[in-house]
């Protein structure tokens, strides 16, 4: 199969994660929120390229009909599970100091968290990301990386070494950490350290 771009891989990973969690694929809107794309037409474009490259098949008459093909299909049926560490707690409202101790581990499909030593989970406390579908008490799946594209949801350390989950923007002479809550103001910083990118969300419905 033809190699995927980083964005296409992120979208494919998110689709596989949702199929594993729910038994059916995510909506275009959910995909856009997960990978930091505001335009549904841009998401459709990436899905078309995934289809052209043979990774997925879509039914144009059904909005959620995304079938994973080839080896990736087997990954969603029978695969190994990796115990991903849940690391402390990060506030999605007012930033709190990042806790580096591992509280527990959470099982996730190996295909979703390729490079398990670079993936961790954090529990959200606060309501600043509710418009991105991330709520108080959710667990976010984070891939460790030190850079991000504008619009991606990241775990970042502020100038005061505080950890927070926000949408990332690098602007002319500063960084903007944007909450997904219209009642809250962005955090404007001269310096920021990206810890990782949020690639998925887990919510207990009980």
UniProtKB/Swiss-Prot annotation:
Q: Which InterPro entries match?
A: ArsR-like_HTH, LexA, LexA-like, LexA/Signal_pep-like_sf, LexA_DNA-bd_dom, LexA_repressor, Peptidase_S24_LexA, Peptidase_S24_S26A/B/C
Q: Give the enzyme's main class according to its UniProt record, as a single word.
A: hydrolase
Q: What is this protein called?
A: LexA repressor
DNA-binding region residues: the ranges are 28-48
Listed EC numbers: 3.4.21.88
NCBIfam families to which the protein is assigned, alphabetical:
lexA
Query: From the UniProt record, which GO molecular function terms apply?
Result: DNA-binding transcription repressor activity; sequence-specific DNA binding; serine-type endopeptidase activity
Recorded hits in SUPFAM superfamilies, A to Z, give:
LexA/Signal peptidase, Winged helix' DNA-binding domain
Annotated coiled-coil segments of the chain: none
The site feature described as Cleavage is recorded at 92-93
Q: Does the keyword Hydrolase apply?
A: yes
The record describes the protein's role as: Represses a number of genes involved in the response to DNA damage (SOS response), including recA and lexA. In the presence of single-stranded DNA, RecA interacts with LexA causing an autocatalytic cleavage which disrupts the DNA-binding part of LexA, leading to derepression of the SOS regulon and eventually DNA repair.
**UniProt xrefs under Pfam families:** LexA_DNA_bind, Peptidase_S24
Which GO terms of the cellular component aspect does the record hold? protein-DNA complex
* Keywords in alphabetical order: Autocatalytic cleavage, DNA damage, DNA repair, DNA replication, DNA-binding, Hydrolase, Repressor, SOS response, Transcription, Transcription regulation
Q: How does it assemble?
A: Homodimer.
What are the positions of the active site?
Answer: 128 (for autocatalytic cleavage activity), 166 (for autocatalytic cleavage activity)
Entry's Gene Ontology BP terms? DNA repair; DNA replication; negative regulation of DNA-templated transcription; proteolysis; SOS response
What Gene3D superfamilies would the database entry show?
Umud Fragment, subunit A, Winged helix-like DNA-binding domain superfamily/Winged helix DNA-binding domain
State the similarity comment: Belongs to the peptidase S24 family.
Q: Which domain of life is it from?
A: Bacteria
Residue pairs linked by disulfide bridges in the UniProt entry: none
Q: Output the lineage of the source organism.
A: Bacteria, Bacillati, Bacillota, Bacilli, Bacillales
Please give the catalytic activity noted in the UniProt record.
Answer: Hydrolysis of Ala-|-Gly bond in repressor LexA
């Amino acid at each position: 199969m033809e190699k995927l771009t980083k964005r296409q891989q992120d979208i494919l990973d998110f689709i596989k994660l949702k199929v594993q969690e729910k038994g059916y694929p995510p909506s275009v809107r959910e995909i856009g929120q997960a990978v930091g794309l505001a335009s549904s037409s841009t998401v459709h474009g990436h899905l078309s390229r995934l289809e052209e490259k043979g990774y997925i098949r879509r039914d144009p008459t059904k909005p959620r009909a995304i079938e994973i093909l080839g080896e990736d299909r087997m990954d969603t049926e029978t695969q190994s599970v990796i115990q991903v560490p849940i690391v402390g707690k990060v506030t999605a409202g007012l930033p709190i100091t990042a806790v580096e101790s591992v509280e527990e581990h959470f099982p996730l499909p190996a295909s979703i968290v390729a490079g398990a030593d670079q993936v961790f989970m954090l529990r959200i406390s606060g309501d600043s990301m509710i418009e991105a579908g991330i709520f108080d008490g959710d667990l976010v799946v984070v891939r460790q990386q030190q850079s991000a594209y504008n619009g991606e949801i990241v775990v970042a350390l502020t100038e005061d070494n505080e950890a927070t989950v926000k949408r990332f923007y690098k602007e002319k002479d500063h960084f903007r950490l944007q909450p997904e809550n219209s009642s809250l103001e962005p955090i404007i910083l001269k310096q920021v350290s990206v810890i990782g990118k949020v690639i998925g969300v887990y919510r207990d419905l009980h």
